A protein has these predicted regions:
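Short acidic/His/Gly/Ser-rich catalytic and metal-binding motifs that mark active-site loops
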Residues: 13-17, 191-198, 242-244
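Short loop/turn motifs at secondary-structure junctions
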Residues: 16, 51-53, 85, 110-112, ...
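Short glycine-enriched loops at secondary-structure junctions
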Residues: 9-12, 186-191, 237-238
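N-terminal pre-triad scaffold of radical SAM enzymes
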Residues: 1-26, 44-63, 92-94, 111-113, ...
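Auxiliary Fe-S-binding modules of radical SAM enzymes
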Residues: 2-3, 203-344
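Conserved non-cysteine loop/helix-boundary elements of the Radical SAM core domain that shape
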Residues: 25-38, 59-214
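A short, N-terminal amphipathic alpha-helix
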Residues: 39-48, 218, 222
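Conserved beta-strand core positions
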Residues: 4, 55, 89, 114, ...
């Protein structure tokens, strides 16, 4: 499966949310149809036709665009659908730009998934961020999308002005009730040229530290994943413009935020098992894990290993990636390490 991304930066959105500099985030500066054609042609050079492929309009509020422009852009993806280069289209928009007329148009042009920029379901947080919509409008938009047969995505943030962890948890509970199909999780960053940057520079706003952002994002990730909501991204895509020198003024940015979150969740999951193993006889705690999970279990800069080593001291803690399907934790003697590490 391949996704053909088509960026329409800030197009269709009349609001300037305090954290948003959409031209920087989307990596493009115009929403012209010619620009969309150019992007599509670039991807067609290597994308093999498949009904599993998808075209995705990113970066703006698609249903807020002028109707004529919406139709012109959808005509481009209609051609791809007709040639069976793709099998469906997805796009993102604002919750308050969803109505029956708009959804009729999208459904007629092969759109299958609509992502909503929800960010929070706490009205006080939405107001402080100058989102321009309410939590109720999100609920109504999701219900209408589902009634038309669309899959629904939600984009959520942690670390917004006025948003504490309790607010994040309350939003998660409301999202679970909405039952979206997919979600993205973004820790808020202070981007150059935004109203939030002015607040930060004036000492009126303090972003989350990386560790706290990981903790809160992990909470969202875990609770949504547990009920089958697919997490399709954690953290902003670290493209050249976003990462340009001086563009990110402050905030919990990391190019592998998703891996940090998964490592944190593994730490929380495995800690009780490690402590239980430490009650057994032996001078070493051996963690055997599938090769593909080793970096996540280890944690950034061996963070998880260091954390567990303190808990089990003076025992030695050893992590080994091998060809197994599940993580195994055992307490063994140093003399038996080699044999234990080869167990199935």
């Amino acid at each position: 499966m391949a996704i053909i991304p088509i960026f329409i930066p800030h197009a269709g959105c009349p609001h300037q949310c305090v954290f948003c500099n959409q031209k920087t985030i989307s990596g493009q500066k115009t929403a012209a149809v010619d620009g969309a054609k150019e992007q599509i042609n670039k991807w067609l050079e290597w994308v093999k036709p498949s009904l599993e492929n998808e075209a995705a309009f990113y970066g703006g509020s698609f249903t807020g665009l002028d109707l004529a422009l919406q139709k012109e852009l959808l005509a481009l993806t209609d051609e791809l659908l007709g040639r069976k280069v793709i099998g469906s289209v997805r796009l993102s928009t604002r919750p308050d730009y969803i109505d029956e007329e708009r959804l009729e148009l999208l459904r007629a042009h092969g759109v299958k998934l609509v992502e909503l920029g929800v960010q929070s379901l706490d009205d006080s947080v939405l107001q402080r961020a100058e989102r321009g919509h309410t939590a109720r409008q999100v609920t109504e938009a999701v219900a209408l999308l589902k009634s038309y047969g669309f899959k629904v995505g939600v984009q959520l943030m942690v670390g917004m002005p006025g948003q504490d962890f309790a607010s994040v948890k309350a939003t998660v509970e409301q999202v679970l009730a909405l039952q979206p199909d997919v979600a993205r999780i973004y820790p808020l960053l202070v981007i150059k040229g935004t109203p939030l940057a002015k607040s930060y520079e004036a000492g009126e706003f303090e972003p989350l530290a990386l560790e706290e952002a990981v903790c809160q994002a992990a909470y969202v990730y875990q609770h949504l994943s547990e009920v089958g909501i697919k997490i399709i991204r954690v953290g902003l895509q670290p493209d050249d413009e976003l990462c340009a020198e001086g563009n990110i003024i402050a905030g919990p940015f990391h190019p592998a935020m998703g891996e940090l979150v998964q490592s944190y969740l593994l730490r929380e999951q495995l800690t009780p098992q490690i402590l239980e193993a430490a009650k057994q006889s032996g001078d070493s705690i051996l963690i055997l894990c599938p090769n593909k999970l080793e970096s996540k279990v280890r944690g950034l800069r061996n963070g998880n290993i260091k954390y567990w080593s303190v808990l089990v001291a003076p025992r030695k803690l050893i992590l080994k990636g091998i060809s197994i399907s599940k993580i195994k934790i055992i307490c063994v003697s140093s003399n038996d390490l080699e044999e234990a590490a080869t167990q199935d």
